[in-house]
């Protein structure tokens, strides 16, 4: 949004990681002017009022699903021809529903390897689509809500506005709500009637200064650690006013027996002194990034933990349901794997080397088991560099010593 705004936008509280650096690097490759101060966690972006400074080029998005989906949509709305490349991991993740709707809007997309996947060549629609032609598309978001977020984010580039009908059973979600709220903060309003999304013509992003929220997804690992060990965690500036759906994980911890409180510094989680957790059945559709975190806690519960409505996580950095089942089995924990759910039975984990599948959330979540069980080793722990490169240093700093 900062790149598409008119003028200079300053972003404060930026999380620097492999994903965000690949996104910023892609913007630089497209000719956008940025100033980066990692120590101050500030990025300044010179927006180009809904245009791309160059009309050809190649970008590399790494393993970042957000960069892959958002930048593909942005380039499809632009003028020129571009190549989008990605890591081997990202090349396996679904893109076809987004490609299909972008082609319906007039973009030309050529898959350079496997049909429906990156890498691709994109020829944008600007200058080739009649300015008065109504833009109306249908979209299936069952595989990823990022497809819809991508279209919404670039909708101000479409002068005649955009109408999106959602054809999948799922119509909305926590990340879509975040997208809409942030767009509104930047001056672009999205209407939603329960079935369809409407963006009026003439919408523009306004430049300014934007304070980014703390990463609640990252905070949840440390909140889970408190619940698991009977300890206490406060994450600065994480409050109930945050937009992120992963706040629901804190309510889940409360239902499992942890104490959740407000403090002047941020939300606090205190685990039961005996470290005991209750079994639970939960629909995690809207905060599925924490599925692995809950799976790591589940063996220590007093009953079964059943996680439902998570079939879409099979299509993320790894087949996450299968990865959870496999690694819990390596720990000696029994579970029942289903197409879109998993039931985990309580037990006593044994020492094991946990495989991470180059999935940052597998590495971070399963490290929590090691807080209660000796002999837990995480293979390829630095895959967490994708979103939280200092995770293990932070975790180590919080662990008490004899």
Q: Would you name each region that the model predicts?
A:
Residues 1-402:
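Structural preference for solvent-exposed beta-strand-turn elements
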């Amino acid at each position: 949004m900062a790149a598409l705004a008119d003028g200079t936008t300053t972003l404060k509280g930026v999380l620097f990681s492999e994903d965000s650096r690949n996104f910023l690097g892609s913007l630089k490759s497209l000719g956008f002017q940025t100033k980066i101060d990692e120590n101050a966690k500030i990025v300044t972006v010179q927006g180009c009022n809904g245009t791309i400074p160059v009309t050809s080029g190649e970008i590399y998005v790494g393993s970042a699903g957000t960069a892959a989906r958002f930048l593909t949509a942005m380039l499809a709305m632009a003028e020129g021809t571009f190549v989008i490349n990605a890591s081997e991991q990202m090349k396996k993740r679904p893109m076809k529903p987004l490609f299909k709707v972008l082609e319906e809007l007039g973009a030309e997309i050529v898959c350079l390897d496997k049909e429906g996947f990156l890498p691709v060549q994109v020829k944008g629609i600007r200058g080739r689509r009649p300015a008065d032609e109504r833009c109306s598309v249908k979209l299936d978001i069952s595989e990823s809500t990022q497809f819809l977020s991508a279209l919404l984010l670039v909708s101000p580039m479409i002068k005649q506005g955009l109408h999106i009908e959602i054809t999948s059973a799922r119509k909305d979600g926590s990340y879509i709500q975040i997208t809409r709220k942030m767009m509104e903060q930047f001056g672009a309003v999205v209407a939603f009637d329960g079935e369809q999304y409407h963006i009026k013509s003439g919408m523009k992003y306004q430049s300014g200064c934007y304070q980014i929220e703390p990463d609640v997804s990252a905070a949840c690992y440390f909140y889970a650690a408190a619940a698991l060990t009977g300890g206490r965690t406060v994450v600065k500036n994480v409050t109930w006013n945050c937009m992120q759906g992963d706040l629901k994980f804190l309510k889940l911890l409360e239902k499992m027996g942890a104490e959740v409180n407000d403090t002047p510094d941020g939300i606090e989680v205190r685990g039961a002194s005996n470290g005991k957790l209750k079994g639970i059945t939960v629909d995690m559709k809207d905060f599925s990034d924490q599925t692995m975190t809950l799976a790591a806690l589940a063996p220590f519960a007093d009953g079964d933990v059943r996680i439902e409505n998570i079939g879409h996580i099979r299509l993320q950095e790894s087949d996450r349901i299968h990865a959870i089942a496999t690694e819990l089995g390596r720990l000696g924990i029994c579970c029942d794997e289903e197409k879109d759910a998993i039931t985990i039975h309580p037990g006593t984990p044994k020492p094991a080397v946990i495989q991470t599948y180059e999935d940052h959330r597998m590495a971070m979540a399963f490290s929590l088991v090691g807080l209660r069980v000796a002999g837990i080793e995480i293979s390829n722990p630095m895959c967490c560099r994708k979103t939280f490169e200092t995770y293990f240093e932070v975790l180590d700093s919080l662990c008490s010593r004899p």
